[in-house]
Amino acid sequence: MMSAPFHTHSTVAKIAAVLALTLASSVACAQDSAPAASASAPASTDAARAALAKKEGDVDQATLLKETLSAADKQYSLLKAGKQAVTYDLTYSYVGQQLIQANFTDDKLTLFDIQNTRSHTVTNTVSVDHGVKDNLTASVTLPFVSKYSQSETFSGLSNAFGDISLGARFQPFALSRDLPALTATGTLRLPTGRSPFKTIDGQGLGTGAGYTSVTLGANTSKVIDPVALFGSLNATLAWPAKHLSQTRNGKTLTEVRPGAGIGFGVGFAYALSHNISTTLSFQESISARTKLTLVDSNGVASESKTSMQSSAMLNMGLGVRVSPLTTVNFTVGIGLTTDSPDFTFGMNMPLHF
């Protein structure tokens, strides 16, 4: 009679022992899994930070913005003393327009003609910069121009060197974190390209301005990471082109006196990442009337003036850093006035030594 109760108590004890072991195992598993779960969150956060962190060869955004400014306009950059930089620029521009030619003699219209002109220009430019001092940089620019034109008077391709430019950039004040950078600039443009005033009508296109000019200006820039603001102002004076002998419409062009010009530009650059930046800028230049001296078949000289010209461009750019030493920049420009190119596209690739 006593065996049954003893067997029952033994069975209950065994079941209690099994439940105790199961509960202990569950508690231990919960305690072990809690640290693992809490550790997984920091691990995933660290992985995200590592993915967004600057990699080897990347630059900080301030440095990228300065390089972007240099690509947008080299007038905003300076080199350290003894340093050199070579830059290659490829630029394409398209101009399509209708030219109306009219000649009034004794209040009578003796000549009226409408010419449709389309011009495609590709310019390959190599620029060499040298740091004379930490705050003074000298430069020389050599362009090679390929121009194709379609018109009633001439349709063909012309290839020749353009006008060589000699320039200098000077920073009068040391850089400051609180104040914008200020740079004074000067450029001498020499008439080394094919002059448009010396080409034979219907036999070629000019690849240069045809006269010597000097441009003096100043610009300022301020990097406010991740944005850089910049602006410029300049004035241009030109020497007259004399001793010409170009015959057009029965008259001979003997002298050209270009008018003075002023220009300004504003814009900003924005760093999208450590290796990609964008720019948006506006540029405008205004030139006074140019005086032309013409001699007719009787040897009588007369003077004619062109209209004032205003050229405005809206430029959008993208800079991509492809290596620690090279940033490739692409620019698209849209003409806003009748004196501007209809469309421009440019690629800039600086190589630093």
Named regions from a protein language model:
Residues 74-83, 118, 135, 173-182, ...:
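Short loop/turn motifs that connect adjacent beta-strands in outer-membrane beta-barrel proteins
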Residues 86-90, 126-130, 140, 166-170, ...:
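Residues on the lipid-exposed face of transmembrane beta-strands in outer-membrane beta-barrel proteins
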Residues 110-119, 132-165, 169-171, 288-290:
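Surface-exposed loop and membrane-interface regions of Gram-negative outer-membrane beta-barrel proteins
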Residues 31-108, 177:
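Outer-membrane beta-barrel biogenesis signature
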Residues 90-96, 142-148, 172, 188-194, ...:
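Transmembrane beta-strands of outer-membrane beta-barrel pores
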Residues 99-112, 250-353:
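Outer membrane beta-barrel transmembrane domains
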Residues 120-124, 157-164, 180, 208-214, ...:
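Residues that define the transmembrane beta-barrel architecture of outer-membrane proteins
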Residues 81-97, 203-297:
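Detector for outer-membrane/organellar transmembrane beta-barrel domains
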